């Protein structure tokens, strides 16, 4: 399994002959190494409906005939735009040919702001547990710290956790360090920082808050192998 980070909250997983993208916000992402027009994917997983997470989903999905897996409301909304979707909800798991997806709770919000100043409710925000090849990745999406992260860690043997550290809209570094402890992941990678001024952070400072060898700040385009 190959896992790559592409700035903000964009994660790519290559496993079982498939390419899975999580939260493909590329156009307008000041930290990414990708060009949306060149991105290939078989599956897109979405944590919630904010623009900096849905991003280029529709374009990428249509061009690649990719399946989009998201919460029911968000999946329904995207299906109306001609995208193949599979709707799920928090606590539910589903085994696909590329791996198993389970949605967890997240403490955030989820909605799309239209050009005519309307807000479309798109269901609850989530984190994602993805399991394939005997490895489990937890992408927390956008969230504050919550005590059930302990339960997530107890119920799942997490190999890699992607945790937001930007503050303002999500956990900051200190709370994310507590989350890392509760989750008990073997490796913790910071996400959702330095894309916009309100979420400016030093990822190495976050890494320094964790036990030696647990944290690793990936540069956009950098990969790890499991």
Swiss-Prot record:
Entry-linked Pfam families: Lactamase_B_3
UniProt GO molecular function: hydrolase activity
Superkingdom as given in the UniProt entry: Bacteria
Keywords attached to this entry: Hydrolase
Family, per entry: Belongs to the UPF0173 family.
Protein name per Swiss-Prot or TrEMBL: UPF0173 metal-dependent hydrolase GK2750
């Amino acid at each position: 399994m190959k896992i790559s980070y592409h700035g903000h909250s964009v994660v790519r997983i290559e496993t079982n002959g498939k390419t899975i993208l999580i939260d493909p916000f590329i156009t307008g992402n000041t930290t990414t190494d990708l060009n949306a027009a060149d991105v290939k994917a078989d599956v897109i997983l979405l944590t919630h409906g904010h623009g900096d997470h849905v991003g280029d989903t529709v374009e990428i999905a249509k061009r690649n005939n990719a399946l989009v897996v998201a919460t029911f409301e968000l999946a329904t909304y995207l299906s109306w735009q001609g995208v193949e979707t599979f709707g799920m909800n928090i606590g539910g798991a589903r085994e696909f040919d590329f791996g198993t997806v389970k949605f967890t709770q997240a403490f955030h919000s989820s909605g799309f702001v239209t050009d005519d100043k309307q807000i479309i409710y798109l269901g609850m925000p989530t984190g994602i547990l993805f399991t394939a090849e005997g490895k489990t990745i937890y992408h927390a999406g956008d969230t504050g710290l919550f005590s059930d992260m302990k339960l997530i860690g107890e119920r799942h043997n997490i190999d890699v956790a992607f945790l937001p550290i930007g503050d303002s809209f999500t956990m900051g570094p200190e709370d994310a360090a507590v989350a890392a402890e509760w989750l008990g992941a073997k490796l913790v990678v910071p996400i959702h920082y330095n894309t916009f001024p309100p979420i400016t952070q030093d990822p190495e400072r976050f890494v320094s808050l964790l036990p030696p060898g647990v944290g690793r700040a990936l540069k956009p385009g950098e990969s790890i192998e499991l």
